[in-house]
């Protein structure tokens, strides 16, 4: 685990060793309107099978708070770009809680505070490899899986994703929106 960039050899090896079954991604964007708030909590659960003892998830963010692998908390091994996972089984479930940053460059989750109307706007741009700026993932286009997104946001915000809304819960000045699972897609399309 030494670089934010992936080599062709690394991606080929990881594709042979790991098969992703699903992603469940929770984004807490309730603090987005506060210009002094640089980031947000992202919680990702990935189900995958593996033929190797170790692999890594891609993530570019200020901090990884916790990693739970197959029901057990494991030490966080994060080098600023990769979250190391070892002791893998044939079938695995990993949950990563991390802090991601809002972008002002259009990479990842871009936040724009509009001076004309005083409102906050967010949008994502993940091509070619910037989903990892928002949630922990296997950031390779050949490693497709279904995604379920759950977004907590200020009440009154329009929250959109690749699928229709499955559930919406109002929580006073906030809302939580759960979207139906996607078909298997690459991370950069989410």
What residues fall within each predicted segment?
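Acidic/His-enriched low-complexity segments
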Residues: 1-190
């Amino acid at each position: 685990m030494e670089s934010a960039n992936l080599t062709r050899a690394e991606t080929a090896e990881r594709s042979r060793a790991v098969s992703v079954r699903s992603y469940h991604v929770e984004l807490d964007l309730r603090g987005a309107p506060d210009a002094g708030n640089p980031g947000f909590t992202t919680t990702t659960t990935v189900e995958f099978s593996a033929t190797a003892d170790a692999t890594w998830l891609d993530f570019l963010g200020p901090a990884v708070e916790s990693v739970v692998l197959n029901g057990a908390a494991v030490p966080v091994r994060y080098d600023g770009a990769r979250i190391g996972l070892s002791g893998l089984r044939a079938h695995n479930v990993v949950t990563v809680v991390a802090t991601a940053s809002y972008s002002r460059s259009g990479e990842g989750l871009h936040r724009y505070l509009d001076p004309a109307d005083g409102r906050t706007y967010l949008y994502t741009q993940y091509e070619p490899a910037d989903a990892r700026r928002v949630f922990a993932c296997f950031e390779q286009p050949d490693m497709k899986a279904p995604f379920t997104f759950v977004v907590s946001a200020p009440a009154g915000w329009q929250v959109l994703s690749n699928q229709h809304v499955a559930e919406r819960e109002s929580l006073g000045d906030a809302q939580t929106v759960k979207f139906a699972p996607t078909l298997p897609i690459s991370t950069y399309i989410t």
